Every structure is written in structure tokens, then in C-alpha cells.
Amino acid sequence: MSQNSLRLVEDKSVDKSKALEAALSQIERSFGKGSIMKLGSNENVVEIETVSTGSLGLDIALGIGGLPKGRIIEIYGPESSGKTTLALQTIAESQKKGGICAFVDAEHALDPVYARKLGVDLQNLLISQPDTGEQALEITDTLVRSGAVDVLVVDSVAALTPRAEIEGEMGDSLPGMQARLMSQALRKLTASISKSNCMVIFINQIRMKIGVMFGSPETTTGGNALKFYASVRLDIRRIGSVKEREEVVGNQTRVKVVKNKMAPPFKQVEFDIMYGEGVSKTGELVDLGVKAGIVEKSGAWFSYNSQRLGQGRENAKTFLRDNPDLAREIELALRQNAGLIADRFLQNGGPDADDGDAAAEM
């Protein structure tokens, strides 16, 4: 390459850097300092602050140790699958760390007694039971903009009824009104949520699309906007019952990470939700321990470091409940092997892994 060509390339690079500096200074003058920066210049930008879901397995499956703050989360599934329970457990975990939490109860169905059993501090939980969808989303926007709330739950998107629908007649057809309401609200909320580092969890219900020949006919309410804006989407399903003799004492639950902007998606985890107790932590220790090879299973017997935990899963759970020090030791070992466990979750997942189950549940 000739000297003239080299000089031309150098001049161009100098011109580009000068033009970039001028553009950056103009943006900062117009919109304030910090309105634009190099991503690596602020180390805090890279770090992701999380809140535990109350389930060790789900925290591992999410890839970052919990649900991310400053993001929109969607939890959806059929009725009585554990959506509100999972949201309340996340609130309880945030409160344990001193977080301020709010619950927008659009369904008017929150049970304070059950919330207390899950570990929620009712004295410090902000609750609103709005009359209309507009009111619910305006309250959500105000709380997020305050910058003082750490976790905010909206239960549920399906119950966010537009004012026009409430004031209208019982048979009026107002197509797309709820979807437009959600789309506008999320456009307003998304920047505030990021700046305030507040996690907003939307609980959603599922509906059936009519005339679908191929693929799953299931869809969520409130249009497509929430699917795009959510950083994490969790599909929660009841897959069986937990019994003590003949009495049903809980649900076997499967959660699939359908969307995850923070880590690889499509991982799924199974755990027990016990009535009046929430996620069974001891049950998770047994199941995850076996999956990671930390807890040995020989026939019906479970053992850890040559110490027998019990014959049968329920007896092993009871033993760990009565020996919290041993349970903590197993939990620590599981957290150290989180990467191995997450890989095994992914082997059972995949975008189409649940099609058969979804069809079976319809």
C-alpha cells in the first residue's frame, strides 16, 4: 500500500473519532450526562442482581441464580398450577433481604393467611385492589417510578379489565382493547423498570385458540406485547399429586423456562408445592441431589456420604426436615455443582419437549 493510501486511511479514522466525540458531547448536552456511554465503562451495568424464586432447582435452571431485577417477568399456566404461589415466594425471598414489595391484586383473590404461611411479611407488603385495568397499570407505573419498590406483582393480566368494558353492557364486544391497554402500558413501563431496578412480575392465564390444526392451541391473554417485553417467561404446570397415604397434601409441579434473555432458555425443573407450605425445599434437595450424584439412591433407599436418609422419598424428606444442618450441607454441595445440574435440566428441555404434555393436559 502506498504512503498516500495509508495517510488517507489515517485521516478517515481521525475524522471518525472526532465525529463520534462531537456526536457524544451533543447527545450529553441535549439529554444529560450518562445518556450515552460505552458499555464496559460502567462495571455495574454488567452485573445482574437477582431475587431467588424460593426454589433451588428453578434458580439453577434460570442460569443466574434467580429472577433478574430491573426486568419484566411473565409467569403463566393453567388454573391452580402454582403461579401466585411462585410469585409470593419470590416476594418472601426479597423481603428477607430487606426489599420493599407490592402486590396489585386485580383478581381480588389474595389470601393473606396463605401468603403468611409462605413467609410473606404482611406488615410490609403493599397491596392494591384496583377497579379497572387502567387504574391497576397507573398504580404500577407510579410505584415503579418511585424507585423504592424492589418487586411488584400484577395478578393477573387477564383480570386487567378496561374501563370501557366495565362501564359498557354485559354483552358488548370490544375486540383488542385489553391488548392495546397492555401494549401502551408496557411501552411506558419498560424504561422506568430498568432505571428503578424494580422487578415486575405479571401473572397470566392461558386460553385456547380456535381452529388450530397444528402445534399447541394455547395462548396467553393480553396480546403479544408482554411476550416481547418480558425478559423471562415461565410456564408452570401441575403434573401430579403428592400423597400421604390416601390424602393429597401437595402438587407435583413442572416449570419450564420458555424465554430467557439472561441465560440459555428451555430448561425445565420439577418440584413439589405442598399445601400451606409452598415449595418443598427438602424434596428439591433429594431430587437435585440424585440428579447431581450427591445423594445416592439404591433401590428405595437414599443416602448421603454413607449416611442413610430414609427408605422412600417422603421418609428422606422427613429426615432432612428434622436435620437442618445436613440439609444445609447438601444445599451447599448442590450450589457448587449448579453448572452440572443446569446442563442436565437442558437435556430434558428443548423448545418442543412439552408438546405431548401440553396436548395431554387439554
From Swiss-Prot:
Q: List the disulfide bonds.
A: none
Q: Where does ATP bind?
A: G77, P78, E79, S80, S81, G82, K83, T84
GO BP term, pick one:
SOS response
Q: Please name the taxonomic classification of the source.
A: Bacteria, Pseudomonadati, Pseudomonadota, Alphaproteobacteria, Hyphomicrobiales
Q: Does the keyword RNA-binding apply?
A: no
Tell me where it resides.
Answer: Cytoplasm
A single Gene Ontology MF term assigned here is: ATP-dependent DNA damage sensor activity
InterPro entries attached to this UniProt entry: AAA+_ATPase (IPR003593), DNA_recomb/repair_RecA (IPR013765), DNA_recomb/repair_RecA_CS (IPR020584), P-loop_NTPase (IPR027417), RecA-like_C (IPR049261), RecA-like_N (IPR049428), RecA_ATP-bd (IPR020588), RecA_C_sf (IPR023400)
Gene Ontology cellular-component annotations = cytosol
The name on file for this protein is Protein RecA
UniProt lists the family membership as follows: Belongs to the RecA family.
Q: Which PROSITE patterns match?
A: RECA_1 (PS00321), RECA_2 (PS50162), RECA_3 (PS50163)
Chief subcellular location equals cytoplasm
> Which Pfam families does the UniProt record give?
RecA, RecA_C
| Function comment | Can catalyze the hydrolysis of ATP in the presence of single-stranded DNA, the ATP-dependent uptake of single-stranded DNA by duplex DNA, and the ATP-dependent hybridization of homologous single-stranded DNAs. It interacts with LexA causing its activation and leading to its autocatalytic cleavage.
Keyword entries, A-Z: ATP-binding, Cytoplasm, DNA damage, DNA recombination, DNA repair, DNA-binding, Nucleotide-binding, SOS response
